[in-house]
C-alpha cells in the first residue's frame, strides 16, 4: 500500500464531506489525515490516504470526480 495526497475542491454543500468519506470507506481505503477548509461557498480539502494499488486509486479518483458538488480532484503526491 502506498501513501498518496489528494486535493479536493468543491461546493460547501451539506453532507458532501460525508459522501466523500463514504466513497473512500466503500473502497476500503484508509484515511491517514484529512484537512478541509471552507471559504464562502467553497471548500478545499487535503486528504492523505493509504491506497492498495493503482487500480483502486483510479477508481477512487473517478468516483470522487463524479460526485455532485465536487469540481476538482487532484493527486498532489
Where do the model's predicted regions map?
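A conserved regulatory-domain signal marking ACT and ACT-like small-molecule sensing domains
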Residues: 1-77
Amino acid at each position: 500500500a502506498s501513501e498518496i495526497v489528494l486535493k479536493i475542491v468543491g461546493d460547501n454543500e451539506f453532507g458532501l464531506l460525508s459522501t466523500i468519506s463514504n466513497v473512500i470507506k466503500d473502497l476500503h481505503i484508509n484515511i491517514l489525515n484529512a484537512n478541509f477548509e471552507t471559504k464562502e461557498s467553497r471548500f478545499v480539502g487535503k486528504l492523505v490516504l493509504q491506497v492498495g494499488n493503482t487500480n483502486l486509486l483510479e477508481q477512487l479518483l473517478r468516483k470522487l470526480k463524479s460526485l455532485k458538488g465536487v469540481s476538482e480532484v487532484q493527486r498532489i503526491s
